Design a protein with these regions (language model features):
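Positively charged, proline/Ser/Thr-rich regional signature most characteristic
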Residues: 2-80
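Thiolate-centered catalytic microenvironments shared by cysteine-dependent enzyme domains
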Residues: 3-4, 60-148
Length: 148
């Protein structure tokens, strides 16, 4: 399985049918203890602060290009990857990742509708084994239209 075309908002049942596609990367932005207890099979964990700049007094801006490229590469994102993001807090963290990807020039992404709670409540499979991502090479190519 290699070709994957998912909508911007993906339903849990659609995502479950898509597990196993070569270019799919599921990114969990839940709290670390939640990830250790349960996550979608194959999902890599990303700590939310890694996609935020930490320069005082401007906390929360985008990290610099080199940092952003390193972080996204380290979790397995390249230009061919379709990212599905979710969290356990209403989608804010996952949505921030998708906006960050858009700003960085990567438009292949989806948000899991309802996040981890919808996935679990609908009885889809869960895992507690950590996933080690395959490192890829991500290059930031600014999409100036995406800046707020």
């Amino acid at each position: 399985m290699s070709e994957l075309d998912l909508p911007l908002i993906v339903e849990p049942e659609t995502l479950e049918k898509s597990l196993g596609y070569d270019n799919l990367l599921i990114v969990d932005l839940s709290k670390a203890d939640t990830y250790r207890k349960m996550h979608i099979p194959g999902a890599v964990h990303l700590e939310y602060p890694q996609i935020l700049g930490a320069e005082k007094p401007k906390m929360g801006l985008l990290p610099d290009d080199a940092t952003l490229a390193r972080v996204l590469s380290s979790i397995g994102i390249d230009e061919h990857t379709h990212v599905v993001a979710y969290d356990d807090e209403g989608g804010g963290r996952a949505s921030r990742l998708l906006w960050t990807l858009e700003v960085a020039g990567h438009g292949r992404y989806s948000l899991l509708n309802g996040g981890l709670h919808a996935w679990a409540n609908e009885g889809h499979p869960l895992d507690d084994a950590p996933v080690t991502p395959g490192v890829r090479t991500f290059t930031v190519q600014h999409n100036n239209a995406a800046y707020a």
